[in-house]
């Protein structure tokens, strides 16, 4: 018999830095998920990623207190800010420029994000990343 799914939980946890402190601990604890088991499994799965990169994580938890997790790649905005060497996007994106990135950097970001994007090919993924850059006030050269 299959395990009965109780619900799902979406968290954004820094890669390699999952610990029982807020916001991770309380969110998992109130749903009956073993916090230390999650932290160990998450940190092991994100060991090859850059430490501290925000990882959107979808946790499905079951009636027998077990869980599965799907760890996605960091958001496009994280990669764009890193490539442009800025802390945040522009306050007025259509009028201000927060930074600049090259088309090669956009392609690199699109290749890294390809599995999480709703695109058929790399050109479609690049268009999605270009739209994110435009909305953040990052100029593409």
Swiss-Prot record:
The keyword Thylakoid does not apply. GO terms for molecular function: large ribosomal subunit rRNA binding; structural constituent of ribosome. SMART domains: RL11. GO terms for cellular component: cytosolic large ribosomal subunit. Keywords: Methylation, Ribonucleoprotein, Ribosomal protein, RNA-binding, rRNA-binding. It comes from the Bacteria. Coiled coil: none annotated. One or more lysine residues are methylated. InterPro entries: Ribosomal_uL11 (IPR000911), Ribosomal_uL11_bac-typ (IPR006519), Ribosomal_uL11_C (IPR020783), Ribosomal_uL11_C_sf (IPR036769), Ribosomal_uL11_N (IPR020784), Ribosomal_uL11_N_sf (IPR036796). One of its GO terms (biological process) is translation. NCBIfam families: L11_bact (TIGR01632). PANTHER family: 60S RIBOSOMAL PROTEIN L12, LARGE RIBOSOMAL SUBUNIT PROTEIN UL11M. Part of the ribosomal stalk of the 50S ribosomal subunit. Interacts with L10 and the large rRNA to form the base of the stalk. L10 forms an elongated spine to which L12 dimers bind in a sequential fashion forming a multimeric L10(L12)X complex. Belongs to the universal ribosomal protein uL11 family. Forms part of the ribosomal stalk which helps the ribosome interact with GTP-bound translation factors. This is Large ribosomal subunit protein uL11. It comes from Ruegeria pomeroyi (strain ATCC 700808 / DSM 15171 / DSS-3).
């Amino acid at each position: 018999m299959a395990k009965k799914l109780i619900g799902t939980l979406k968290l954004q946890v820094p890669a390699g830095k999952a610990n029982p402190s807020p916001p991770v601990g309380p969110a998992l604890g109130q749903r009956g998920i073993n916090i230390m088991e999650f932290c160990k499994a998450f940190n092991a799965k994100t060991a090859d990623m850059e430490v501290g990169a925000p990882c959107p994580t979808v946790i499905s938890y079951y009636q027998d207190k077990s869980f599965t997790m799907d760890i996605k790649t960091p958001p496009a905005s994280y990669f764009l800010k890193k490539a442009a060497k800025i802390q945040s996007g522009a306050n007025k994106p259509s009028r201000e420029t927060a930074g600049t990135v090259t088309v090669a950097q956009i392609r690199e970001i699109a290749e890294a994000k390809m599995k999480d994007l709703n695109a058929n090919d790399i050109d479609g993924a690049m268009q999605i990343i270009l739209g994110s850059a435009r909305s953040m006030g990052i100029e593409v050269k």
